[in-house]
Amino acid sequence: MWDFDMWIFPVILLTDPIVAREMLTYRTRIIRRAVQSNAASNNIGGWQYPWASAFTGREVTSTPGAAELQHHITADIAFAIRLYLYATDNLSWMVTDGCELAFNTARFWMRRAVYNSATDKYDIPTVTGPDTMNPNVLNNVFTNVMAAHNLFLGEYAGCVCESFINLKNEDLNEMIRTARGLRLLHESNGDFNPQFEGYVVGRQIAQADAVLLAYPLDLEMEQSTKRNNLNIYGPVTSASSSAMTWSMHTIGWLELDELTLAADNLRRSYQPYLRSPFNVWNQGPVEFPGAPNYVSGAASFLHTMINGYGGIRLRDGEMVIRPRLPPGTTRLSIPTINFNRFRFSLEVQQDGSFTIRQQAIPTMPTIQIIIDGVSHEPCGINTACAFHGINSATLKLVGANANCQLKPTELNIRLADQNHAVVTSCTYGDRSVADPKLPIEYNR
């Protein structure tokens, strides 16, 4: 599931959100009983997703360690829900499907987090992050940040589906306090994020882990920290690492405007992984062959083109676009991108300028288009038009639900330093949705 939710799903979401929604149905409806059973078998509340599953949702992985320790998979799936909300603002779907998953996976992390009186924060012990070379660690930074993302989304679900979830504000307060209290390791001497408690610089890792905090997790951090993470973890990553590692390093260097380093990592992200005669992706480089037809590697290359050189970021209430041309090319064309019923293509020209072409659609998009600081309205129903820019564009959602707001993810705050009144009374607002009477209960 990690491969699907983190690498494949985000690409499909931008190109065809209807198909993306159908893919989420497997996680929200089909395997509901199995994920409840998985958590109960580990004496943990909420929903716990398997590392790998088939039709039943039961664990089918051939790697027991993944099932036992790589619990970030549960938060990875909730992260896919977060991205779907960013891209579609589909609150009706949230009520019928998403709330139950978002809230019950957050409940899982409420039980998984352990209070540490010495730090007045929460730890997540005995986990393995994406880096499987260093298993069973304390406070893996990727896992902790993903868990915090999940907890904030769970609190948001409690607001959106307030009338269907029998909760008090104190319950949602506790969810937010746990999220903000999760440890986020940062070493001031060196200004970087240790991958886990006790990590020593120079220790080898299997694949990108702490580097993922910048993208795709989009955690707010200092540029210097982002740079140091790339410099520290790049040289110690195993030569047998999958293509996704170097795709994420490419995007990281692009965020820092280090175009030469980005180009080096771009070549490293695909050239060793393609197999002739049809350039099929392999899980490993030539000297370390792995699974053939490795779709996750191909998907990560699309991340590099769409989110890296295309510069696209999905965030709460907006899509940010900061495009640039890939090295050795004269044009970058992404034929279809969707954001809240606004369908468009993106083309980057040789001089670095770009064009957003709105495609004719039967409904009026509820967005504002800001290009190089100038605001534009989308063209009318069933009408195509183009917008030109030089530096960046932002598509902003108009008329978002003001009654429920997804709070920004923040961690590493002592409980004593947190404001206890973090949740306000919220209602669903004026939007009309069906009442599915979701069977959600809360027990820490």
Each language-model region and where it sits:
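Non-catalytic C-terminal accessory modules of carbohydrate-active enzymes
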Residues: 260-443
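Aromatic-rich carbohydrate-recognition surfaces in CAZymes
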Residues: 1-114, 143-144, 151-154, 158, ...
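Beta-strand segments within the central parallel beta-sheet cores of soluble alpha/beta enzyme folds
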Residues: 22-26, 93-103, 121-127, 264-268, ...
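Active-site core of glycosidic bond-cleaving carbohydrate-active enzymes
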Residues: 2-30, 79, 83, 87, ...
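Acidic/histidine-rich catalytic neighborhood
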Residues: 104, 108-167
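Acidic/His metal-coordination segments adjacent to aromatic residues that form catalytic metal sites
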Residues: 51-69, 124-139, 276-290
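Glycine- and aromatic-rich loop/turn segments at beta-sheet edges
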Residues: 35-50, 113-128, 186-194, 242-244, ...
